[in-house]
Amino acid sequence: MSIVMRILLLTACAFFTASIEARHVVNFNSGWEFSPDGWEGVPRKLSIPHDFQMEMPWKKEAGGNRGFKPMGAAWYRNSFVTDSAWGDERVFLDFEGIMCIGDVWINGEKVASTEYGYLGFEVDVTKKIKPAGGTNTVEVWASTGDQWGSRWYTGGGLYRPVRIKTRPVRSIARHGIFVSTPDVSAVSATVRVQLELDGFRFDKSFWGTSNSANNVALTSRVEAVAIVFGPDGRRISEVRGDVPMMDYRKRTEFALSDMVVQNPELWDINSPKLHMVEVQLVKDGTVIDSDRLRFGIRKIEFSPEFGFRLNGRKVFLKSMSNHSDYGAVGVAQFDRAIERTLRQMRSFGFNAVRCSHNPYSESFYRLADELGLLVVDEFVDKWPEGTYLWSGRKPFLSMWPELMTEWIRRDRNHPCVILWSLGNELQQSERFSGYDTGDWGVTTYRMMDIFAKRLDPTRKTTVGLFPTRAGAIYLKDPRYRKKPLLPPELATVMDVASFNYRYEDYPDYLASNPNMILFQSEASTSKWLEPYFAMDRARTVGVSWWGAIEYWGESNRWPKKGWNYSFFSHSLEPRPQAYLIKSGLLPEEPLTRIGVVEDSGERLVWNDIHSGQYLLSESWNPGGKEARDVFVFSNAEEVELLLNGCSLGKKKTRFNVAKWDGVAYIPGRLEAKGSNGSAHFVETTGDAVGLEIVEESPGEWRADGEDLKYLRVYATDAQGRRVPNVSNVLRVSVEGSASVLALDNGDHFTDDMFCVSEKRMHKGFALVILRAGLEAGDVRVTLSADGIAQSIAVLTSK
């Protein structure tokens, strides 16, 4: 938050005659003890976020769906001292997520459980903690559940932040502020604030009463005040309203009068302006509680005529769909890991993310707000009747209202969120489609849709659909191609019809259901840009490539540890195909890129879709085939390929692709030139003699014990050119207040672990991930490899 904003908020709080102490929020991420075997052994000290499953060895027998990692459970333990400053406030332990299931004890008493690791919870421990000055012990048991509780790698443990929070007995509830902007134009915008309050039932000692002519009247008045601050910190609007006293309800819900903001600065993908609202509860001139949050003023619209509009302008979603691991750190939700991923996607032209298939961490949505990314926010994968693909100890169908309440109330103030997705690929089996009503999820969807709109009436809902026809007719069924092609039953009742794959069938679907709003919620990476160019982008919402980044789990064979038909490796190194996608998503930037075929790759049918990926490189070194196929990716209409200055011909591009088959290998320089002035070359290098270190986010490294620093390392020859065929062992040593969190090389097939200080480079590449300590200062990193000169980087944490 800016200094200007802090000053203005303090001024706002001081507007009234008095105020109570502010809410307290204590970071509870450090000082944990960890033991995978209970407390009989010697526990290990660590800080969270932490993914204990990523530290377990790869095991073939563990199965590919969870990334060949064994299932397991572990214990965490920490302590805190009851602070006298908390006074009479209620005290909560706030867990943003325990993967996959977990239980919580405080001072030896079990106080909470969670059945869905992708959503958080809080537990009121006010009556469980010791008096001021006393030490309280918190213990957490976390389990991955059994192997088939999930289809992908989930990780395990305290993988998201934990906090201690306090708030007054009479207060704004958890996620109790809801800000919406029902009317938005360039001239003015309506801002609506709805509140949920706790503790405002009748209490004579609080409200007071007077008797007059046999009537009882309250002598105290409680006001709710909402103050809106602009992106620059200026106070731009305010509204007040009386808090109603509810005789019997634990929670009070009401809306304040609408505010009007003149000439609003809108949140947009190209200019993500964020406002702030502060809500104060004021009793007789004294602020008794306050809370604040960021929001965006923006208008979203969906229609079969134009797909999606943001602030009145057509926007086509250029999206990725991925599970929420971050490579070598597993599912541990470090802000920096999330940010580097989103920034990388943004730089390659993506403007949206479909969360798959679960809510992401709170930091993800905050960063998406800041970076101007659109989000399709997804609730769960399936709606199962039993425990298959559900890790919870309680049935999903008994829990979804509670879980949906937490999910939507948590995320509804983020302007990045434009659509609620309630599930994914339910028509694979009726046991995944919710209640046993025989309609492939239609009844269950309608129930969930009503419930979702009770919590947030401003957004539409959808479900990602498996590529079957109505009646769950699969690809192998002879009726699959029989006309008319009828979409799955759910597609005809949803607000937005989200289809995974099969974009070529959309015209047939529209012929029978012309009012459907279409979104290609998953597209095959093996088809490259075809799903993007072949769609009617003027009338559809967007396209989202499945598995744009490598992820752990959903592997079809050992020793491949996960999905790898991707544009980016799990270390976020872009493959040549990534530049192809960029050339399409950012046509205003002339781009040409070479991809040399190393292997045609495997081909398989996955989810009734033909999948696979060429193994491409940017290497022109000896050791490969004597005749090599070469792709040229370009947003030029025509490209020319040259070898050592001699033209190999010109070709027109189709979907930004041209291909030369059987190019004879001759050492030297292979160059591609586009008719739009763009060019790219690869060339034969010398032997590796040095190491190039590329620091990501230079100058940005907080000494808070949680921030990460990424160093990309490349083997180079005497001319400084990167050498792609190097596999020397790289060794890392660190001096200063930091430690090696992980050492990666981008190899999705290796059995090596990440929590090491030495590892073989893979194709001349390695990635060093450092975790900051708590002391600011210089950190010296020394990298060495046999036969290669060492390299040193001096970094500074602040």
Language-model features and meaning:
Residues F206-S210, N214-V225, N270-H275, A627-D629, ...:
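Short flexible loop/turn segments that cap and initiate beta-strands
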Residues K130-G133, Q194-S303, W660, I666-P667, ...:
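Extended acidic/polar, glycine-enriched regions
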Residues M54-T82, W86-F95, M99-N107, A112-E115, ...:
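Active-site-adjacent substrate/metal-binding segments within catalytic domains
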Residues F28, P49, P57, G64-N65, ...:
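An acidic-aromatic loop/edge-strand motif
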Residues H24-V42, M71, I98, Q147-W148, ...:
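Substrate-binding clefts and catalytic carboxylate motifs of secreted carbohydrate-active enzymes
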Residues L119-E122, Y248-V261, R654-K659, T750-L767:
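Aromatic sugar-binding surface patches on proteins
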Residues V26-F28, S35-D37, R66, M71-R174, ...:
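Accessory beta-strand-rich segments of carbohydrate-active enzymes
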Residues V193-L197, E278-Q280, H610-L616, V630-F633, ...:
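Beta-strand-rich structural segments
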